[in-house]
Amino acid sequence: MKTATILLTTFITLSAMSCSQPKGTKDYLKTVLDNLEEIQSATYYSRVETWHPGDTAVVYDLTYFIREYDNPSDTTIGAIEIQTSADNHSHLYYAYDGKMKASVFEEHKGIMIDSFKVDRNLPFRPVGPPFYNYTKSILRYILTTKDSITLEKRGNENTFHLKLTIHEDRQVEFFGRAYKIPDPPFRDEDPTSRYEIWIDKKTNLPYKYRREMSHNISAETVSDATFNNNKIEDVDVTGYFPEGYEIRYYGDKKKTSGDDVDNLIGNPAPGWTLTQTDGQEISLNNDKGKVVLLQFTSAGCGPCRASVPFLNKLTQEYPNADFVFYAIELTCKNISGVQAYKKRVNAGFNFLHGTEAVRDAYVIQAFPVFILMDKNHIVHKRITGYQASVDNEIRGLIHGLLK
């Protein structure tokens, strides 16, 4: 794709491959990158926010205290991160040291360790890099890529604001460096990737980025940063592990318990009362004597969106009073987010706004999950994930229960 440069008074659009970039822009980005390269360690507060596309309601908004270290010995991400509570800097949430990542689950008093021994068939290590490592990768990409990109520059006397748009046939993410993401099944979305970076002109360092994909939007803002006061030789992430927590390893089979998924089958479905997109409250008890199909879904889930055409047809195929279907969205913060998602995917069926209590009761750990119950609301079948073969499987199960 041929790139072009357009220069306006207050707005500049340029391509990294253009020879006619406004003088000073590329040199300034090199200066910022050089400053980032000088950071051997940093501590800062990090505010992380996420949104669903088309929805202004924030799904996730939390602030952490971060210890970040440059780690050249790690040829994947190239950094160490220790994420703790903003109020208690010893209270660990997450850590990555180049050899493993550790995630703390307080509700289960457990720590999940991933030593990357399980092959995920990915070209990158699935680790979210810390802020300065992440923005460094983006700037390095801008200065060196041969991809088709557009870079918009705005700003004022205090801030240099960049907006990077990547016009490739696959989305580009940054895990230590740029990677073109393999297309997942059922994704028919816009592959355009958009990144924005805000740079403080006093320090010539980034303080915020925003990442926008067709399936997810996120942003991170840092504050109160200090640099190069800590040594990587002193880092021991295991020293932050809370005492008494069970350590488990990614890939190990979990032992079954009274709360395990399999124990739902053959037992009465947990009851619930949830709000529909039209504001009406719906209770499972209202559908006594009906076969009920639930889909637990997420606005950010590609396979969930891919199932919508099938579910639209399904509700038309079984319009009688003996069958009812509900999609329960579990990641939107409010009903307006569910409404926006329903409209965006052209769903012609009922959407309910789920709760954490419902998520826990049905042991939902991934999306989508289908739960089919008989007329007595005994759980008959659970299906995790979606592919074309699921259509006929669900149709056959419903037909059998309606006899």
Language-model regions, residue ranges each:
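Short, internal strand/loop/helix patches
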Residues: 339-376
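Thiol-/selenol-based redox modules, centered on thioredoxin-like
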Residues: 372-403
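An acidic-aromatic
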Residues: 71-131
